[in-house]
Every structure is written in C-alpha cells, then in structure tokens.
C-alpha cells in the first residue's frame, strides 16, 4: 500500500469524524479505533484528533448544544451537593479613605470560579471566552458586598464582564467594579493611627446547603504594583472566612482586611508646628516687664485665638464622634499652657497692681492724716484742779507776755499733768473752771486761768507763740504716777479732709485761727485721780518750755513744711493706729497662731514674688512642655 492509498484512507476517516461530531445523538455506527504506526507524522494525528483546533462552526455548534437544554434558573447539581465557589480579587486602586463618612472606595476585578457540568463539551480542548452577553444565559452566583454603600460595574466601552468556559464545565466569571465600602475608623491615635478596612463577600440567597464560598488560595488577593492611597501607606492584607447565621439559614462570608497607616507629615506641617510655635510665642510675655499689661494680654489672647482656629479647622475634617483624638489632646494641652501663661500674669498683676499700690496709696495718705491730726485733735484732760496758776506764771515768765491771739495755749501745772509731749502742737489746755466756757460753734479751744481770759485780745492779726512743752510725770510721796492723755485724730476720709481745707480757706483771715485749729475736746478715758492732790510734789526739771514768736503767715508755712518733711518713720508712727491691721496683714509674716489658710495665702501672695514668678516660668514652662512632647510622641508612635 503506497502513500497515495494512505492519504485516501486518512481523508475518509476525517470525513467520518466530522460527520460524527456534527450529529446530535449517538452514532448508530460503531466507532473504529485505528492503531497507526509510530512512524505516522504528528500532523496526521492532529488531523484525526482535532483537539487543538476549532473554527466558528465548531464553537457555534458547541454553544447551541449546551444551551439548548440549559436552565439558567437552577444552580449546578441541583438537589445534590452544594456548589463550591472560589473567589479571588485583584485590587487596581484604593482611591479614598474618608474620615468624615467612615468609608473607602476601591476598584477591583472580582473573579468567581465554579463547575457546571451542564456546560461541558468535548469537541475541543480549547477554552471558550465569552463576553457580557452570556450573563443573561448562564447561571452565576449571587455574591454581594456586605459592607458596600454603593457599587457599579464599569461599562466603558462595553460592560466589563467576561466568561471563560472549560471543556470539563468549569466556569470562570470576572467582573470589573468600583464599590464604596464602610470602614469603621479608630481615631483615638489620629493622626498617628493605623486603620484596617475590610471587604466582606457573601451569597445573598444561597445558604451553605447550596453554595460554599471560599478563597481561591492563600494569594487570592492580588495588589497592583505601586498602589498609592492618598494620605495613607499600604501595609498589607489578611484574608479570613467565617460562617454567619441568619433567620433564613447559615451563609459563608469571605473577609479581606487592608491595613493602612496614615502619613503624619502633612499634619506636622499644617497642625503640629503652628501649634508648637504659637505656644512658644505665648511665653515671650515672661521676658516682658510685668507692668506691660497690654502687650502681655494681647500675646496670650492672640495665641488662644490661633489655637482655636487650628482646632476648628481640624474638626471640620473629622466626624463628630465621642472619642478623644490624640490631636485633640495635643491642642488642648497647648491651650492649657497658653492659659497658664495668662494665669501667671493675672497672678503677677494681682500682686503688683493690687497689693503694692495699696501700701503706696496708704503711705501717700499719711501726710494728709498728719495734717488732719493738726486740725482735728481730741484732747483728754485729767481731773486736775490745783497748780494751774503756778504753771501759768512760770510760762509767762519764761515766754514773755502772751500774744493777743485766740489760739494761745495756756499750760497747766506740773501737779495736774503728766506724761504729756506736745511737739509743735497748738493745743491749748484749760482748767476745769474754763472747760465750761468752751464753745463748739466757734471750734476754738482756749485754755487759761481765770485772770488771763479777760486779758486776751480777739484780733487775728497778732502773732502766735510757738511753744514746746514736755511733761514727764508727777511725784507723790510714794511713787511717780503717770497720767495717760490720749490725743487721736478722728477717722476721716481724704475727701473729708480736703473739704475741710477748702472750707477753711474760704473763711479768710478773719477766722484763720479758728478754721486752722479746730479742736474737738472730749473727755475720753479720763483717769480720775485717786490720790490726794496735797501730796503731789512738783518734779524739778520735768518741764522744759521753748517759746518763740512767729507771724501768722510764717507759722502756716512752717507747719506745712514740718508736715511734708516728716520721715518715713515719723509717718509710720503717726499712722500706726490707722493702718496697724492692714500693714500687719501685708508686710508681716503670719504669727504661729494664725490658721493654715492665712499662712498659705500670705506665702502665695507675697508681693516680692513678682519678678521671681517670671524667672521661674521661663524655665518651668518649656521644661514641662518638652516633657509632655516626649511622652506624647513615644506613646503614639511606638
């Protein structure tokens, strides 16, 4: 048999093979199997088998055959074992992770693979690739995304669906879609947070009795190279699966989690550095003078305003949730430091502008009170009856004739007065007989004996003697008995003193002596003598009298000069009774008997601490803020 005969036999067999492939039912003729020799070329063998070749007619015949009896409403192996469906995902992009909406958008290719024996074919070994039009003719699993908010299938330029049919009936279904899935973000460490956004795949209607979902393999999730997520860095992914139970049955759920970490560099530039610089700016006030109220308060308030603006800007980008974020703590601490700087200045302002000026104001009022002491005096006269005439005679002998002035002071005897010291005071003492002649309307006090009262002229133009009298005490047979005579000005305000001065000037020279020296005499704390006046002996050298004559104008000028030339010690002595309580509270340390609150208040509000507080704040504030930053960043970064 030659080659020609072999070719004819091969052509005949090929025709028979084609006829058998095109027939719908089983062939009534028996199938022959030819054992060709090993020397037969492979081309001849391919002509007989035809597994790797297919034309349009062959594919059309295959599709027509498998779809003619195919029911799309029934799952594969209906009534039998559940259909295993394997799932794989190829992630092309993660476009956005929104903190406000708590979701993220992902674009991916979803592939599902299952086996449907109704679609098996044997005409060829080639896989058949079919487009989106087969979606309505074939059964597909009803998978959906559990946490999806919105999703759509891309349809540019055509609907992005594809089917691959294998000869054994395996179907691989792929779809390109974009979905927006919910992502529960944990913002407690914002913006140094790490998030895990998951995507859940589940069958909508088929329970585990019909469909069993599973991941294709351990590498079922594929990520495109160079995946870039805005404001985040991709860390990795994990895949899990679990069975969930509902009222309609149990379902298999596939879960993939994408781990991402937020990039903090943008927040360092936009939030942290401005916040730190603003906080440091508020500390400039510690180097300013403590009486620069406007500058220090302006810096503090401006810093608070800037921090509040930054905080409001951040809140607009974040959801309104109840958890406290790390950036909230940082901004709040910065606000607290700025507030402490303002509070520190309030403390200094209270010490400097409240405590110290009060003491200075009282010191400025002391000369006025000394003037008031000259004008308003209370003279307490002891009950002395004898010896006034002798003292008067001695005063007249040493000082000369008395001037014709209503302001002349007639001195009492040594037996009746003791422990009196009048320095440049024109307070006139009178006997008990002359006390009844005092007139409150004229406010003049004239102390003299009965013989001298009739001789005093009433003119105001005569000169007034200036007398300095010192009484040391009385000597009895047994001991020296001092007599206490209290001289004290009335507690009057500065406004009353000024009104008295103005009214005094308005009366003119006619009443100058009367207006300048108003004496209010009241018998306070009068010590009644319990001794016998006859036993009182005059102490020698106990009275020293200095007398001189001054004109009225010179005396007024001299009085004013003597008042304003007083030293601090004299002013303190003159004002000791008025300000004893207030001075002791501010300038003296609390006694051991004081309560704890008083001692603590004294230690806390000492005026001399004003410069020290600023010096301490220059170091304590930066040190505390630096320590806070170390703890803050170590906790949230590592």
Swiss-Prot record:
Subcellular localization, as worded in the UniProt entry: Postsynaptic cell membrane; Cell membrane
Location (main, coarse): membrane
Membrane topology: Multi-pass membrane protein
CDD domains for the chain: LGIC_ECD_GABAAR_theta, LGIC_TM_GABAAR_theta
Signal peptide (residue range): 1-21
Assigned protein family: Belongs to the ligand-gated ion channel (TC 1.A.9) family. Gamma-aminobutyric acid receptor (TC 1.A.9.5) subfamily. GABRQ sub-subfamily.
Protein name: Gamma-aminobutyric acid receptor subunit theta
Organism annotation: Mus musculus
Lineage: Eukaryota, Metazoa, Chordata, Craniata, Vertebrata
